């Protein structure tokens, strides 16, 4: 059928189908570019100074940057498949209010910035750029409790509340031990002590020796003797159990009750050495009770000279053995060996070494300025009846103690002369101004120069200076220098 040119144009213009031309794609591209230029031209209408004064809103009317806008922007692309199925099953003729609002592809902020919202189609400028766009959406739908572990937001009470199971508590203890920090281990043990039964705690610590030692030390420090005894009883540590039981005497103030308690400790399973100490402790307290009662009576009566001149400053009860010996040497030195308060009786009963006895007796008698007793303390007789002075502690220490108690020079010179080492003797004599000892020693050494140097240290015109001059002018001494 022949058609005119006008009929063909009318046909193609009236038909729903359009003929293909190569210019169509260029027309669409030109339209897209034109739209972009129109969008970008909006920036010219907004001054940079006024941009902060404008309130940016989304297509839904929500202010851009608000909390509700952020939630809707984030939740727009995270709708679940379950919600989509519900939307399909709903009546298509339902009202618009019942349908969820579709996520907006653009917002005013994205238009002004020239880019699309993350998750939507890219603009031409974004498509041509080499850098891919990234979006980070917070998980706003998750409750805070689910990501507390990641944000390190657990409070101490929440942490403790989580550790309700015994295995979690034991794991906590093992982690503390692995850190090798005593403070952390002790803190965990305090928590376990409060939250676990004794049987479970003891059983778990029995195989964890490091934690066990920390608990034992902690219980000793706080004085929890009851729990400590239960622990030793569970571990079958009989000797440590006995020692812990013995420590309870420190809490008993009454002397008679403490003595009776110590008596019950004698039969406990101690080592041989510890058993001897427990027996001595009981015997000493028994002696102290007797001595205290007798001396209190003598002091109140006022008939004993030593108690009148030197009143007691404290009770002898519960004092150490050395203090008790000093007390006896001070107030009861001359008593017979058969009495409980006699120093010799104490020495034999408790097997006090000679050095300790001499030191204590010397300090006590020197304090009383009883120089005759001091002299008798160091005087011994041999089997021929000859006397000799002997000091198990060394005479140099005797001189130091005597000088500390303000002994006169005559007494000091006697014991300085008994020092065997010449250099030590000269040093002590010079230090304590025992002039005769220095002069005689220099004469025996035939040391003229040292004697001449010492002459400047004595008082002019004194008897010591005259003695030195007489020795220096003597022709009978052959000086070595």
From Swiss-Prot:
Proposed to be involved in endosomal maturation implicating in part VPS33B. In epithelial cells, the VPS33B:VIPAS39 complex may play a role in the apical RAB11A-dependent recycling pathway and in the maintenance of the apical-basolateral polarity. May play a role in lysosomal trafficking, probably via association with the core HOPS complex in a discrete population of endosomes; the functions seems to be independent of VPS33B. May play a role in vesicular trafficking during spermatogenesis. May be involved in direct or indirect transcriptional regulation of E-cadherin. This is Spermatogenesis-defective protein 39 homolog. The modification Phosphothreonine is found at residues 21, 116, 131. The modification Phosphoserine is found at residues 120, 123, 129. Gene3D superfamilies: Vps16, C-terminal region (1.10.150.780). Residues 122-155 are annotated as: Disordered. GO terms for cellular component: cytoplasm; early endosome; late endosome; recycling endosome; vesicle tethering complex. It is found in: Cytoplasm; Cytoplasmic vesicle; Early endosome; Recycling endosome. One of its GO terms (biological process) is endosome to lysosome transport. The keyword Protein transport applies. It comes from the Eukaryota. Interacts with VPS33B. Associates with the homotypic fusion and vacuole protein sorting (HOPS) complex; impaired by VPS33B. Interacts with RAB11A. InterPro entries: Spe-39, Vps16_C, Vps16_C_sf. Its main location: cytoplasm. Keywords: Cytoplasm, Cytoplasmic vesicle, Differentiation, Endosome, Phosphoprotein, Protein transport, Spermatogenesis, Transcription, Transcription regulation, Transport. Belongs to the VIPAS39 family. It comes from Bos taurus (Bovine). One of its GO terms (molecular function) is protein-containing complex binding. Residues 141-151 have a biased composition (Basic and acidic residues).
């Amino acid at each position: 059928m022949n058609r005119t040119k006008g009929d063909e144009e009318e046909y193609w213009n009236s038909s729903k189908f359009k003929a293909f031309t190569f210019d169509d794609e260029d027309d669409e591209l030109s339209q897209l570019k034109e739209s972009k230029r129109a969008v970008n031209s909006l920036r010219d209408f907004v001054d940079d100074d006024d941009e902060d004064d404008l309130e940016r809103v989304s297509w839904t009317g929500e202010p851009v940057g608000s909390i509700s806008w952020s939630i809707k922007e984030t939740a727009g692309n995270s709708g679940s498949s379950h919600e989509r199925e519900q939307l399909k099953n709903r009546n298509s003729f339902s009202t618009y209010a019942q349908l969820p609002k579709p996520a907006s592809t653009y917002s005013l902020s994205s238009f002004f910035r020239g880019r699309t919202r993350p998750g939507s189609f890219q603009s031409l400028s974004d498509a041509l750029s080499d850098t891919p766009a990234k979006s980070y959406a917070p998980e706003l739908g998750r409750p805070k409790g689910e990501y507390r572990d990641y944000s390190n937001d657990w409070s101490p009470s929440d942490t403790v509340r989580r550790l309700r199971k015994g295995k979690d508590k034991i794991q906590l203890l093992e982690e503390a031990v692995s850190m090798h920090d005593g403070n952390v281990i002790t803190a965990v043990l305090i928590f376990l002590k409060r939250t676990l039964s004794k049987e479970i705690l003891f059983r778990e610590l029995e195989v964890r020796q490091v934690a066990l030692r920390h608990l034992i030390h902690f219980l000793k420090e706080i004085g929890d003797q009851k729990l400590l005894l239960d622990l030793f009883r569970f571990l079958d540590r009989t000797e440590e159990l006995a020692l812990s039981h013995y420590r309870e005497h420190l809490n008993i103030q009454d002397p008679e009750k403490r003595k009776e308690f110590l008596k019950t400790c004698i039969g406990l399973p101690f080592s041989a050495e510890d058993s001897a100490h427990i027996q001595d402790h009981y015997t000493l307290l028994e002696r102290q009770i007797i001595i205290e009662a007798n001396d209190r009576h003598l002091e109140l009566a006022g008939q004993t000279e030593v108690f009148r001149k030197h009143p007691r400053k404290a009770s002898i009860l519960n004092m150490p053995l050395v203090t008790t010996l000093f007390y006896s040497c001070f107030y009861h030195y001359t008593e017979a060996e058969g009495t409980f308060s006699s120093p010799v009786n104490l020495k034999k009963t408790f097997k006090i070494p000679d050095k300790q006895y001499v030191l204590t007796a010397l300090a006590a008698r020197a304090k009383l300025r009883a120089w005759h007793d001091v002299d008798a303390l160091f005087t011994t007789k041999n089997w021929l009846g000859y006397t000799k002075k002997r000091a198990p502690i060394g005479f140099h220490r005797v001189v130091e103690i005597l000088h500390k108690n303000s002994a006169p020079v005559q007494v000091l010179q006697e014991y300085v002369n008994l020092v065997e080492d010449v250099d030590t003797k000269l040093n002590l004599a010079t230090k304590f101004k025992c002039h005769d000892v220095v002069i005689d020693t220099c004469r025996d050494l035939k040391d003229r120069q040292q004697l001449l140097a010492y002459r400047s240290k004595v008082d002019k015109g004194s008897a010591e200076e005259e003695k030195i001059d007489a020795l220096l002018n003597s022709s009978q001494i052959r000086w070595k220098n």
